């Protein structure tokens, strides 16, 4: 199934395999999510499934969203995501999507917003080297030259300089699920994922495994 699931990053820990090796893992509280809309090719032009996740207060949901969510029997859902599918067989409006749709050993792609670090210098933001620290140098952490002189007489767009660092949507691909805990809605994923603890994550079956497209992935 190409439908993913929404979850919340709980933090990192370590997982011991059968050989006693410590493996860094991320704990994700995934779902349960509700199917809030089913889109069909006849009506919408393509087939897709929309799911909702996360509790919120009623006053934070506007009337159009409240009317949309009422159709599936759910009103207080904070986050909505859509997944394109080839067919809608076996899917029902209001049905729950849980971690049971994943299994240990499966490859997944995890998307989220990276940690925001505010306005940062070019060294922290881009990993540039610093200037000399002695021999009278005053250029310790300054950016240095940013372009030519009279021609072109400007700084080209995209020049790597100081600015806001982090807070970007990123995807970590090909992570392995080491354990699925259906009782606590937990996914134990090998490695790290974007975001800080509490961040919203989108977990989808991997589109590629190695150099080949994953079976059922698009």
UniProtKB/Swiss-Prot annotation:
In terms of superkingdom, the source organism counts as: Bacteria
Q: What cystine pairs are annotated?
A: none
* Annotated GO CC locations: cytosolic large ribosomal subunit
Q: What Gene3D superfamilies does this protein map onto?
A: 3.30.160.810, Translation factors (2.40.30.10)
Record has Chloroplast as a keyword: no
- Pfam families xref list: Ribosomal_L3 (PF00297)
Which molecular function term from Gene Ontology is one that the record holds? Answer: rRNA binding
Q: Which UniProt keywords apply?
A: Ribonucleoprotein, Ribosomal protein, RNA-binding, rRNA-binding
Instruction: Provide a GO biological process annotation.
Output: translation
Region entry Disordered, spans: 127-167
Q: Identify the InterPro entries for this entry.
A: Ribosomal_uL3, Ribosomal_uL3_bac/org-type, Ribosomal_uL3_CS, Transl_B-barrel_sf
Oligomer and partners: Part of the 50S ribosomal subunit. Forms a cluster with proteins L14 and L19.
Write out the function statement from the record: One of the primary rRNA binding proteins, it binds directly near the 3'-end of the 23S rRNA, where it nucleates assembly of the 50S subunit.
Q: Which family does it belong to?
A: Belongs to the universal ribosomal protein uL3 family.
This chain belongs to the protein called: Large ribosomal subunit protein uL3
Mind giving the lineage of the organism this protein is from?
Bacteria, Bacillati, Cyanobacteriota, Cyanophyceae, Synechococcales
